[in-house]
UniProtKB/Swiss-Prot annotation:
Residues 411-415 are annotated as: Binding site for the 3'-end of tRNA. This is Aspartate--tRNA ligase, cytoplasmic. It comes from Bos taurus. GO terms for cellular component: aminoacyl-tRNA synthetase multienzyme complex; cytosol. Keywords: Acetylation, Aminoacyl-tRNA synthetase, ATP-binding, Cytoplasm, Ligase, Nucleotide-binding, Phosphoprotein, Protein biosynthesis. The gene is DARS1.
């Protein structure tokens, strides 16, 4: 007589066979073979951002990540994410989906990439948790293209939760080090996607605006023979049998191009600063947007060109990137960025007067500290209602050796900084174009003349008066969006404590 276990097994086997036979949808789901460019099908993949009520009733294919999944009886709800856009998808037992298919969909690991065929359906009630609120996708086929590991180093929902909400409701948030240690995952969040898409909207109009103004884009060396500004804050690298340095700035080469009659130049490239500054706004490597321009009579001609370029960028961001701005503001609320036309320009002595009136004690030739910069930004906002302004005529003592002195006041200089929300984003000046004067100033700063001989020599054969400045891309992005740490706007940040990933 057969045992009870044997009898049970004999009953289960036909049931398994029957269940398999009932899986009428087995060809409609599964794990796809690895894509190795074996074929090029005619299948058209639709962007999630294009899934609107106008497509209701259409059968579409979508490739996306599984953001969340929730099984409920004979159906499973998925949220499919594609960059900063997402849509709800429904897998329900019916003509196109079996119980096994619903179970398969419910067990797909978060962040896996899937190909989904489905019918776009208009919903009666808006889906508030998705960007595509008026439609959902009724799934007919689903295939895993690339599976994610079941345990994620961070949860994306936690990574986009506002800190205030986390504190008030006791819900999880993700700290900065965890984000940066797992940057590839963190960059998938809707906030990160929005930040870096907006950042690309800074570089493009910078290049386009200046090109339309007659500027020439140049590339300058990053490996140089001497500290580019004569300071100690440089990275030393082995260069065959000698030492070389990573450029702190393209400054000297921009000027040499002006001496070579390019007249107006700009460059976009990495800048290296060996500063042991673990602050919210300092990086050891960042992207510099640099401008240099010959002028006719006054360096303010250049100041106005730079300010106009930045204003054009701000206008473009506010016009073209409202979705991204709103996405970032959901997690990091901030007042809209304000600016004036023409740009407000104050002299350094006026700024000192405002600070002194607010109770700050400062000497006439003292540089602005970070707290005083921020205070000045608040005072300017209160008085002029702008987040963007220019500070002109800095003390000569706090500027680099190549800065032109003010002819009316030897303690001042023809130099300027530009500020956003009370923080400096550009430093610039009229450059000394006379070889004798630049030699005197270099000696005054203790710079070895032999190491900048090529630079000084470039002025010996006739040099036009010129000025320029350097902008930090990550800092502009941070301040435009009202963020509080430049690491949020650097894709893979480098600071004194971080060299990976």
């Amino acid at each position: 007589m057969p045992s009870a276990n044997a009898s049970r097994r004999s009953q289960e086997k036909p049931r398994e066979i029957m269940d398999a036979a009932e899986d009428y949808a087995k060809e409609r789901y599964g794990v796809s073979s690895m894509i190795q460019s074996q074929e090029k099908p005619d299948r058209v993949l639709v962007r999630i951002s294009d899934l609107t009520v106008q497509k209701a009733g259409e059968v579409v294919w979508v490739r996306a990540r599984v953001h969340t999944s929730r099984a409920k009886g004979k159906q499973c709800f998925l949220v499919l994410r594609q960059q900063q856009f997402n849509v709800q998808a429904l897998v329900a037992v019916g003509d196109h989906a079996s119980k096994q298919m619903v179970k398969f969909a419910a067990n797909i690991n978060k962040e896996s990439i899937v190909d989904v065929e489905g019918v776009v359906r208009k919903v009666n009630q808006k889906i508030g948790s998705c960007t595509q609120q008026d439609v959902e996708l009724h799934v007919q086929k689903i295939y895993v293209i690339s599976s994610a590991e079941p345990r994620l180093p961070l949860q994306l929902d936690d990574a986009v939760r506002p800190e205030v909400e986390g504190e008030e409701e006791g819900r999880a948030t993700v700290n900065q080090d965890t984000r940066l240690d797992n940057r590839v995952i963190d960059l998938r969040t809707s906030t990160s996607q929005a930040i870096f898409r907006l950042q690309s909207g800074i570089c493009h109009p910078f290049r386009e605006t200046l090109t339309n103004k007659g500027f020439v884009e140049i590339q300058t060396p990053k490996i140089i023979s001497a500290a580019s500004e004569g300071g100690a804050n440089v990275f030393t690298v082995s260069y065959f049998k000698n030492n070389a340095y990573l450029a702190q700035s393209p400054q000297l080469y921009k000027q040499m191009c002006i001496c070579a009659d390019f007249e107006k130049v700009f460059c976009i490239g990495p800048v290296f600063r060996a500063e042991d500054s673990n602050t919210h706004r300092h990086l050891t490597e960042f992207v510099g947007l640099d401008i240099e321009m010959a002028f006719n009579y006054h360096y303010h001609e250049v100041v106005e060109e730079i300010a106009d370029t930045l204003v054009q960028i701000f206008k473009g961001l506010q016009k073209r990137f409202q979705t991204e701005i709103q996405t970032v503001n959901k997690q990091f609320p901030c007042e809209p960025f304000k600016f004036l036309e023409p740009t407000l320009r104050l002299e350094y002595c006026e700024a000192l007067a405002m600070l002194r009136e607010a109770g700050i004690e400062m000497g006439d030739e003292e540089d602005l500290s970070t707290p005083n910069e921020k205070l000045l930004g608040r005072l300017v906002k209160e008085k002029y209602d702008t987040d963007f302004y220019i500070l002109d005529k800095y003390p000569l003592a706090v500027r680099p050796f190549y800065t032109m002195p003010d002819p009316r006041n030897p303690k001042q200089s023809n130099s300027y900084d530009m500020f956003m929300r009370g923080e400096e984003i550009l430093s610039g000046a009229q450059r000394i174009h006379d070889p004798q004067l630049v030699t005197e100033r270099a000696l005054h700063h203790g710079i070895d003349l032999e190491k900048i001989k090529a630079y000084i020599d470039s002025f010996r054969f006739g040099a036009p008066p010129h000025a320029g400045g350097g902008i930090g891309l990550e800092r502009v992005t941070m301040l435009f969006l009202g963020l509080h740490n430049v690491r949020q706007t650097s894709m893979f940040p480098r600071d004194p404590k971080r060299l990976t990933p």
